[in-house]
Amino acid sequence: MIKDNLVKSAFNINYMYNANGILKDARSVAVTQDDIYINMTGNSGMATAGSGDVLTGIVAGLLAIGCNVENATTLAPYIHGIAGDLVATKMPKASIMATDIIEEIKNIMPQ
């Protein structure tokens, strides 16, 4: 199963499909053509409906402002996790919603 070994799964996805990717988990794994990154930001409160959609939106937003695919793949989980960590300082983790994560992104990203 993918979840049993995220790093190996990320490597296999890259090898089999020649693709960058993000495996979202408590410690998300991002894989590019050159490296595998383990994201250490984020918290258990982010395991909520829509959180993965927020992560996808961050990737798309980074691409839209000119980031290359590798940078977007590795930066998005970090930004997502930092936003979730900021939310967790303001409310109980069990109360976090995807919209709360979105609201914190403006405090991380420059205008």
Residue ranges of predicted features:
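Short, charged, surface-exposed loops that flank catalytic or proteolytic processing sites
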Residues: 1-6, 66-74, 92-96
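Glycine-rich phosphate/dinucleotide-binding loop and adjoining beta-alpha-beta core of small-molecule
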Residues: 1-41
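A general alpha-helix detector
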Residues: 9, 57-58, 83
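Structural signal for hydrophobic packing residues in well-ordered secondary-structure cores
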Residues: 17, 21, 63, 77-84, ...
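Acidic, glycine-rich active-site loops and adjacent beta-strand->loop/helix elements
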Residues: 27-28, 45, 77-81
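Short pre-catalytic strand/loop immediately N-terminal to key active-site residues, enriched for Gly-Thr
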Residues: 38-50
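Short, small-residue alpha-helix embedded
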Residues: 48-79
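Charged C-terminal helix
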Residues: 83-111
